[in-house]
Amino acid sequence: VWACPWAGLGRAHAEGLVHGTPAARLAAATHCVTCHALPDPRHLDRPTWTNELLPKMRVMVGLEPPTTEAGFRDIDLLRAGKAFPEKPLMTRAAFDLAASWFVDNAPDSLASIQEPGRIRVELAGFDVVALKERHDPPLTTLARIDAAGRRVFLGDVGFQGYNVLGPGLDIREGNKLGNIPVALDVDGADDWVACIGHFFPREEPRGQVLRMRRRPDGSYGRIDVASGLPRLSDIRVADLNGDGVRDFALCVYGNFIGRFSWWEGKGNDRWDEHVLLDKPGAVRCVPVDFNRDGKLDLLVLVAQWTESLFLFEGDARGGFTRRTLFQKPPSWGHSGMDVADFNGDGWPDVVVANGDNADFPTSPPRPHHGVRLYLNRGGARVEEAWFGPMNGAYRLAARDFDMDGDLDIAATSFFPDYERSPREGFLLFTNAGGKERWDFQMATFRQSVAGRWLAMDAGDVDGDGDEDIVLGSLVRMPTAVPSKLKEQWEKQGPSMVLLRNRAR
């Protein structure tokens, strides 16, 4: 008998709703939570529930066959991966009853959550430097700062590789990979690169892990570490079992099929994979001693319908115990994460972005999108301490950008409300409240609409002691953008912008 591989994860998140019959509410609470947390009907408008989401759910519960017309691709691979049940998980009557609860409680429309007047259009203390050379059109998937080497990495869909830039955004090298780089971790002379394979959602396994080794003469040697993987999203290199050999943690985001795993280095360019989470949607991972026991843990943010933050507590010998720090409804759209001690208590805290809004061609703004700060309370517990609304929040970095002794947050939005608040494509949340009171003021730079910022990183690229920011623009997506803005991006938008910090 087919069973949902994510059974038991669900929790109710939709309280206080009065429309619909008790039987409809019970049907939704009974059936939906076998695979994910109970969705909140208010997170999507009624047309999206009716025309987009519920028809797809009929397929996912086995009441309708998957078709390309319904938005499914690589159907044979999905069936082989058991993405669909062999038998219906519920009757049509039960589905229709549960569906009525979502439709009855959904709003007719959703409003933007950002107030345009609250964003200060002046980024004090930063100079804006655009990369003079550009990929035409800009399709940047990787923006990474190597502070130790004073280098910037720029990956692009069309280039199928990455460029190495100097601190002034001068192009020094180019590495063609034959694949799309989306994440890179530097380990000595090695650039560990995660390649997604397909930028848009597919099941065809074309993901790769490459180790690019810099030779003394400036050339690169390439080692194909792993291939034939679902779509990758992040890679982090560390010694995870204490044997002195480099391992790496890998986010295999996939689409319907994916996983999170760590790869054990065996020497002689060999690695063994250990799967820690057999679910798609792993977005970001951070190796960190989160529980302060002196052993390295893995903090993993998972999107898709799981929408959870997991802590894998390490034993320093390669063993990991999974803890769920939180789980949100499947419409949450987790997209970015950083780890830093915000309140100065010695415990690493987590700042998270949720704003992925590419599920449907006409995805409306979502009232729950934004940036959230979770304080580490020990005992595998986190507490939400602050929420900053931000349409389409995507990538972020926590640093003391103004060097006043507390942490600020830089964040991009890949899905801003272009009609009401187009400048929220990049926001700097400057902390004016210190380490005990969260008072973040929003600002952006005047040229913030010059690109659609998918990629971001922060680090001291010029070696002057303060934190700079790089933004990478990807201008082609099937979601709605004003035609004038899109034309501007295509013709003259930069591939990358450096926000050079002048705090020192």
Regions found by a protein language model. Name each.
Residues 1-3, 216:
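Accessible peptide chain termini
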Residues 3, 10-14:
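Boundary at the C-terminal end of the N-terminal hydrophobic targeting segment
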Residues 3-5, 36:
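Secreted/luminal cysteine- and crosslink-motif detector
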Residues 17-21, 25, 31-504:
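Beta-propeller-forming repeat regions
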